[in-house]
Amino acid sequence: MSSKITIIGAGSVGATIAYTLSSQDIASEIVLIDINKQKAEGEVLDIIQGTCFRDPISIIAGDYEDAKDSDIVIITSGIARKPGQTRLELTQTNVNILKSITPEIVKAAPNALYLIVSNPVDIMTYVFTKISGLPENQILGSGTILDSARLRCGLSEHFQIAQSNIHAYVFGEHGDTSFIPWSGAYISGVSVDEYYELEKKLGKDIEPIDKEAMLQYVQKSGGEIISKKGATFYAVSSSVCKLCSLLVSYSESISTVSTMMHGEYGIEDVCLSTLTLVGPNGVQGKVPMRMNKAEIEQLKKSADALKEIIAQIDLN
C-alpha cells in the first residue's frame, strides 16, 4: 500500500508499531523519529534486516523534516510512570514532551492525520488538539481501541466463539473510569444476555457473564502484563496498525477512538472514546449508540474525571 507513516518515539511501543507496519503492507515508507537517534537507528536496522522476507519497504531513522508528506503521524513519545510519581505529575511531564514535539512535526507534516498513542492518551489527544492548530478531523487518539479488543477477547474466551461475531465496546477514558455499555453489546446479532440464554437452551455448560469481573479484566489486563513482563506493546501495536489500515484505505469504519466531544451525550470540551466513524479523511463524526441513563451517567463521570486533570495541567 502506497502510504507514508511517521512514528515519533522509538521506545517499545513505537518500535513495535514500526515493525508491525512493515509486516502488514500498510505503508510503503516508514520514518522513525526519536530524541535518541542512535536508538531509532538500531530499531530501523533490526527491522530492515528482516524485510528481505517481505515486500520492499523504505524505513529510515529520521528527523522532523523527513516527516514531510506523511499520510499519518503516530505520536508515542512519553515516559512511563515512576515509583512515587502521581498521575498528575506524569501527565504534566508527558504534556511538556508533547508541547516540545508539536510545533516541529506540524510544520513538517501539516496535512497528515495524527494518531496520538502517548499516555494518558485522552488528555494528550486533548492537548494536541488545543495546541496544534490543526482541524479536528485530523486528530484522533488510540482511546479505548485496545480496551475494546480486550473486552472482545474476554467474551470470546467465555463463550468460546470467534471474536468476529462479537460487537461490544469500552467507552470513556482509557483508564480507571472506562466502562462497558452493555446496552450496545451484541453477539451474533443478539444481546450478550440473550446469547447466554440461547447457549443454555442448547445444553452448553456455561456460566452467565459476571459483568463487573469482565470490566476488571479489561481495566487490569495492562497492569498485569506490566507486572509480569515490564511493558505492554504487542496488543497496542496491533490495535494502532489496524487503525492505520482504516485511515489509508478507501472505506470508512467505526472505532472507539478518542476525539473531542461537542455536546454528544451532554459532554463538551474533552476527548474520550465513543463510537466514531473514521476513514481516509480522518474523523468523520460520532455514531450515536443507544445507552441507558446509567451508562450515560458513567460516560459523564469519565468526562468529569478527565476534566479534573486537564484543569490542573499547564498548557502554556
Regions found by a protein language model. Give the residues of each.
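Rossmann-like NAD(P)-binding element
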Residues: 52-112
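C-terminal substrate-binding/catalytic lobe of Rossmann-fold NAD(P)-dependent dehydrogenases
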Residues: 132-138, 148-316
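Glycine-rich Rossmann-fold phosphate-binding loop(s) that bind the pyrophosphate
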Residues: 10-11
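Conserved N-terminal Rossmann-fold NAD(P) cofactor-binding segment
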Residues: 29, 33-71, 85, 308-312
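Extreme N-terminal starter segment of soluble prokaryotic enzymes
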Residues: 2-5
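Conserved S-adenosyl-L-methionine
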Residues: 23-29, 133-135
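N-terminal Rossmann-fold NAD(P) dinucleotide-binding loop
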Residues: 14-15
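Rossmann-like NAD(P)(H) cofactor-binding subdomain of soluble oxidoreductases
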Residues: 86-153
